Amino acid sequence: MASLSNESLRKPDSDSRKYRVITLENKLCVVLVSDPETNSAAAALAVSVGQVQDPVEVQGLAHFCEHMLFLGNEKFPEASDFDGFCAVSAGYSNAWTGMDRTVYHFTLAHEHLHEALDRFSGFFCCPLFTEVLTDRELNAIESENNKNLQEDPRREFQLLRSTAKAGHPLQRFGTGSYKTLHDMPMAAGTNIREHLFKFYQGCYSSNIMKLAVLGREDLDTLETWVRQFFSAVPNRDLQPLQGVAPDDDPFDAGWKSFYRVVPVKERRKLVLYFPTPSTYPMYLSKPLRLLSHCIGHEGPGSVLSYLKRKGWGTELSAGTGTQSQYFSLFEISIKLSEDGVPHYKEILSLIFGYVNTIFRKSPREVLQRIRAEMSMMEDLNFRFRSKVRCPKASDGTRRARYKILDRQSRRV
């Protein structure tokens, strides 16, 4: 199948690692990274499955499926096998479920990579979803949800999700709870294990997976191992986010809302959210990066310098927070002082006026110059960045494979 060699990939000048990109017969795309100097090995697998695919009647199912894949498969049926193996091999494993993807990853001592890949591949070939462990893990989901209820960022994001269009997948409760994953299905005459099998078989497929593997072995050895273990992952030829109708804008036209949130912990913030079309297809131009650079500027004449001078705010950040294949959310977050809270309307006017001045009244050549400077700095940062440690390298390479190489770029 298709492959890209180390020589055809762009990488930092100081990066001595060797890379290879291959596609297996089952259409699973893989980045192989060989680093003879590493003491740790790592792997990460991303699949185009996320919370937006949760059935309305079983919200949190994608997240629950992520949990269950760790709890045994036909080849390694013990519930704690993989986590235990990573732990005794000086490593760890974890996973997370987002709106439009789920990512599984691990790191451990380099000499155990071969056996770890054997175990890891079982997640995606033959999970068991045993009834006893399903019941046990429901309690883990409930505990996680109870913990999240006390976390202000999660509370704020759930509020934001609730403002989406009625019926849009963004509105769904991605974490799930005992009520949504047990009580409601039982009341409807079904059980969660049936939903798990149906979801896994209808949403997981090798052709929508991307795998990154980093080890001390040479590229040929890593490729042999990956083919040995991951060629058995079923290819159901699914579309990314199977069964979800495309909708570029989850919010109604003219979406304008203002909410006052009572936090759990003491904090004073003013946050603005601006929904935009997904920026994934614009990975080369990164249009929101220019906006982030200008608004987040901290020098004389900036929004932050004015807020500090007035004693209204101490920190300001601007950038793309939430991203998905449907939309992006550009966020401006200001840490307010106690004196600044009553002046939030003036601060809002200041921000909108600042943006209007920069992007409507500034000469075009000024913005072009700023853009050119940003491009030059990012290129220098890429070329001369220091070597990334193993777990971050594997996750970063996985993200690069998912977002960039999939679009025919040659930069890792």
Model-predicted segments: where are they?
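Polar, glycine-rich mid-to-C-terminal structural blocks
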Residues: 266-286
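N- or domain-start disorder-to-order transition segments that initiate the globular core
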Residues: 1-40
